Amino acid sequence: MVIEGYKFSAPPLLLGVVLMALEWYWLGGLLLFLGAFVLYFFRDPQRVAPADPAAVVSPADGRVVEIVDEPWQGKPGRRISIFLSVWDVHVQRAPVEGRISRVDYRPGRFYAALRARASAENEQNVITIASPRGEMMFKQIAGWIARRVLCWKAAGENVALGERVGMIRFGSRVDLWLPPEAEILVRRGAHVAGGTTIVARWQ
């Protein structure tokens, strides 16, 4: 459980208990259900990263909605976009082992996460990881519901494959940029699990 889950679930749960004691069952039950859903949303299950040293794992749970050629900082590469619904785990994980070379927060808009312009224009954290095999970048992108992106790591920190690095609240999108040296193994429409699903492999 992510610590924010207790903070957001406590008010509706406590108020729900009080209302149930006062025999306001309908409203009390609704608040208890809301509090339970918040606890479910902020769940943080244990994940075991694959032992494959050439693996690139998904940074997030969700559905692959786009795979496109896209340069980054003048370098050729491909982008995998993953949509997180409110039912998915919202903790993001390191796609590769390495050192975080940059964390750039970019303020922006709050378009729906499925819109193509969300990748470029929405509020986001851009996290760059320098791994022994090459550099990789992924974005935590806010949406029209998810208006807070949290990165728990700082530039200069080392991360293990599949290690927790941050979270997006209440559904949004994560983009993963891969250099040509990484062979993409997933297709559009595939459901992926953060820290465990191998989405690419270093060649």
Segments predicted by a language model, with ranges:
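Contiguous, well-folded functional domains in the mature portion of proteins
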Residues: 1-203
